[in-house]
């Protein structure tokens, strides 16, 4: 620590200290330590919607999700508004967790869209993570499976083929 203190280089002894820790430093008297107030983004919904919201690094730079997509706006103090319905997001998150556990699956993903305007109303992944505490998660938890994983289309493409058949009168309702 002494080498860091006498160095001309700026060094952090500790970042994001609590008010109690700050008070203890003040009580030490006159010492050559500078304190600096830093902004910190707080994620009030914790794990709910974590893959949509994303996360930031120690310097509040967006690394993933909306935090990355809107990093400049957020760092400039602007608000952003998403189409996500937090009540729906929470309900789907709980259902997804139950289904994954019921079938002993390793992971799962759900996307719910408004068919009238294509807005994303809910996007969930399991496992998820708490962006307030990235130390308790790993890369697998932070992977947005709904958008970043590869899946074989299989039978999910059949409704599109059928719809196309109806559009071109190849398939009739009676068939």
Where do the PLM segments sit?
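Long, contiguous hydrophobic alpha-helical segments, chiefly transmembrane helices and signal peptides
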Residues: 35, 53, 66, 124, ...
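Short, solvent-exposed loop/turn and secondary-structure capping segments
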Residues: 46, 64, 121-126, 133, ...
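Active-site loop and adjoining helix of the penicillin-binding protein/serine DD-peptidase-beta-lactamase fold
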Residues: 76-115, 131-175
């Amino acid at each position: 620590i002494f080498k860091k203190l006498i160095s001309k280089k700026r060094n952090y002894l500790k970042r994001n200290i609590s008010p109690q820790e700050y008070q203890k430093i003040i009580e030490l008297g006159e010492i050559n330590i500078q304190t600096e107030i830093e902004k910190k983004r707080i994620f009030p919904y914790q794990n709910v919607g974590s893959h949509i919201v994303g996360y930031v690094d120690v310097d509040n730079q967006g690394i993933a999700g909306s935090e990355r997509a809107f990093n400049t706006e957020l760092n400039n103090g602007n608000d952003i508004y998403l189409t996500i319905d937090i009540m729906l997001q929470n309900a789907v998150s709980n259902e997804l967790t139950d289904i994954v556990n019921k079938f002993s699956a390793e992971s799962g993903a759900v996307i719910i869209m408004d068919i009238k305007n294509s807005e994303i109303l809910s996007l969930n992944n399991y496992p998820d993570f708490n962006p307030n505490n990235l130390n308790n998660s790993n890369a697998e938890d932070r992977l947005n499976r709904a958008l970043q994983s590869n899946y074989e289309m299989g039978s999910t493409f059949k409704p599109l083929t059928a719809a196309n058949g109806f559009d071109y009168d190849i398939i009739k309702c009676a068939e």
